[in-house]
């Protein structure tokens, strides 16, 4: 077998490559054609063929998307479909998987819608930063819609059930046809300029793209963007989108949901109202208590400054002054009495009788026995003076101070000089506590 440099593929590999090529080259396409061979098996998926006079292509629309179709697909119906090209690898079938399909009459409207939406988005009309918040408690609501449609019945029914105290003004308008957009725009501008309403609701029921086209009007979209009053848009069903939905401050999927967004359920408000009442009662009691305390303080101040209170104060001051005066007088009298007593004592100290008694005492001191006593004391003093003089010349006293008396043992004579003794001579030294024998050694004199 000859060698081949080319890559050899299996059918599955080839189909996978073809699928990648298709999906990469055609991410999203719109096709206008006629339906043929329409089938819907028990799975809920929708299979059919789109064809024109010269060609056809197999198509599939799976259940999550096919259930939202607003028409019944049937043989020969002309449609506008959007989807992605792909390849069913198991059979090698080339097909279109759709995510949207509508009747072909809406195709031009759809393209106009997409173009206007892109232009308004580029201008910033859909930006979240410019959208207003809904008030926490809506008291007055303007509803712009058809007075005979299902939408107004749904809105009023929900509002009456959830919050019957809400004041609602119905501003009737056409919601379909050539003049509907201009009428809705005019009502919106008048309601906004009045300043009467907390929120303006623009709503209608479901329908085809053509039925809902009034809510894709550029003038209406710009009026919603310019409104000072918050605007809620609830147009069609959950899968319907209009330009009013994109521009409005809040988009609700249905009219009923819009009504639920705007007001609270009165059953949920009852506990909140009761809590608020309890809090109000508590605040009232607190305020009343404070007011009563202030009144009591003012009454005390008034009583303190009343004439009767001032008279009582003066009376108390008079009594206190009387007590202080009495105490002062008592002190003065006591001091006077003390001075009298001291004067009496001084008079007594100069009494001749007391002076005479002193002289008598001195006379008794001159009695002979007293004279002898004084003589004895004088002699004793002289005796002690003589004893001190004798002690000063006593040799033993000198010895007691560390000196010695040297004598010759033979005759007891006192040695007074070193010249009186010879070397080798024995002497006696008298000390304070006894005597000792000593011998004279040769030495210098």
Swiss-Prot record:
This protein's record includes keyword Iron: no
Enzyme Commission number(s): 3.1.11.6
Catalytic activity: Exonucleolytic cleavage in either 5'- to 3'- or 3'- to 5'-direction to yield nucleoside 5'-phosphates
Subcellular location: Cytoplasm
UniProt-recorded Gene Ontology molecular function terms: exodeoxyribonuclease VII activity; nucleic acid binding
Keywords annotated in UniProt: Cytoplasm, Exonuclease, Hydrolase, Nuclease
UniProt record similarity statement: Belongs to the XseA family.
Full protein name: Exodeoxyribonuclease 7 large subunit
Native organism: Xanthomonas oryzae pv. oryzae (strain PXO99A)
């Amino acid at each position: 077998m000859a060698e081949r440099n080319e890559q050899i593929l299996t059918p599955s590999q080839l189909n996978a490559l073809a699928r990648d090529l298709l999906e990469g080259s055609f991410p999203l396409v719109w096709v206008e054609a006629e339906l043929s061979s329409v089938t819907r098996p028990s799975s809920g998926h929708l299979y059919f063929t789109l064809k024109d006079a010269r060609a056809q292509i197999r198509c599939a629309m799976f259940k999550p998307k096919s259930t939202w179709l607003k028409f019944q697909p049937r043989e020969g119906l002309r449609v506008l479909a959007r989807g992605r090209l792909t390849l069913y690898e198991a059979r090698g079938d080339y097909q279109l998987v759709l995510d949207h399909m509508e009747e072909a009459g809406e195709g031009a409207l759809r393209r106009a819608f997409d173009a206007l939406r892109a232009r308004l988005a580029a201008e910033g009309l859909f930006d979240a930063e410019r959208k207003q918040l809904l008030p926490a408690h809506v008291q007055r609501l303007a509803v712009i819609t058809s007075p005979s449609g299902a939408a107004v019945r749904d809105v009023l029914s929900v509002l009456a059930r959830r919050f019957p105290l809400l004041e609602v003004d119905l501003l009737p308008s056409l919601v379909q046809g050539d003049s509907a957009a201009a009428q809705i725009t005019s009502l919106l501008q008048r309601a906004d300029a009045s300043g009467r309403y907390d929120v303006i609701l623009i709503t209608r029921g479901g329908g085809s793209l053509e039925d809902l086209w009034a809510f894709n009007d550029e003038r209406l979209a710009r009026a919603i963007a310019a409104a000072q009053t918050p605007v809620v848009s609830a147009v069609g069903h959950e899968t319907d989108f209009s330009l009013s939905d994109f521009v409005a401050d809040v988009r609700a999927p249905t009219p009923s949901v819009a009504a639920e967004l705007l007001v609270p359920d009165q059953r949920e408000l009852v506990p909140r109202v009761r809590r608020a009442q309890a809090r109000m009662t508590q605040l009232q009691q607190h305020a009343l208590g404070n007011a009563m305390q202030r009144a009591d303080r003012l009454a005390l101040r008034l009583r303190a400054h009343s004439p009767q209170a001032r008279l009582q104060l003066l009376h108390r001051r008079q009594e206190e002054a009387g007590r202080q005066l009495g105490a002062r007088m008592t002190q003065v009298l006591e001091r006077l009495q003390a001075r009298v007593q001291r004067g009496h004592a001084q008079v007594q100290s100069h009494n001749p009788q007391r002076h005479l008694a002193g002289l008598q005492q001195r006379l008794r001191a001159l009695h002979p026995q007293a004279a002898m006593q004084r003589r004895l004391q004088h002699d004793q003093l002289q005796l002690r003076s003589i004893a001190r003089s004798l002690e000063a010349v006593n040799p033993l006293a000198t010895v007691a101070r560390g000196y010695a008396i040297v004598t010759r043992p033979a005759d007891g004579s006192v040695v007074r000089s070193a010249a009186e003794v010879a070397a080798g001579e024995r002497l006696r030294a008298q000390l304070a506590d006894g005597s000792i024998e000593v011998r004279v050694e040769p030495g210098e004199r």
